[in-house]
């Protein structure tokens, strides 16, 4: 069982933990401060998104499992990170000034998709090659037509 827990010295900064049902032990999987120790600076869009979702903490605030359960994907300070369960290694997938949001694994787990500056991107996890699928996000086309239907349609043809 995995869960988010605030640090003992800062309850508003969350780390990713695991509870082992067999051994009945808790252990930290990802220490958010080991990946990013500074003060998180949120974009206005991210502040609004967190406010709508009533999220008031920092650190790792959400995470997603790959379909086969072998990896986790999570945002931290606007960038995306990948954590492999077996190797226990985290790696930064993106490093930009803009925030990557709405990150998801592809069904096969070899790509991640996300939104940056209102455009859809896909990143190959192994090669870290990034492909920008849309270029008109600033014209409100994506916002008005809905991200999810467009993302599904685009990814089905791409992957």
Per-region residue spans from a language model:
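Beta-propeller folds
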Residues: 1-159
């Amino acid at each position: 069982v995995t869960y988010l827990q605030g640090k003992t010295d800062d309850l508003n900064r969350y780390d990713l933990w695991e509870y082992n049902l067999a051994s009945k032990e808790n252990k930290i999987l990802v220490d958010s401060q080991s990946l990013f120790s500074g003060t998180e600076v949120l974009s206005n869009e991210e502040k609004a998104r967190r406010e709508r979702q009533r999220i008031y903490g920092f650190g790792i605030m959400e995470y997603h499992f790959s379909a086969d359960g072998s990896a986790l994907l999570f945002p931290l300070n606007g960038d995306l990170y990948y954590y492999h369960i077996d190797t226990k290694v985290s790696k930064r997938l993106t490093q930009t000034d803009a925030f990557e949001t709405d990150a998801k694994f592809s069904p096969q787990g070899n790509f991640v998709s996300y939104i940056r500056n209102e455009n859809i991107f896909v990143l190959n996890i192994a090669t870290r090659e990034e492909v920008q699928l849309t270029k008109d996000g600033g014209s409100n086309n994506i916002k008005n037509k809905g991200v999810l239907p467009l993302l599904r349609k685009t990814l089905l043809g791409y992957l």
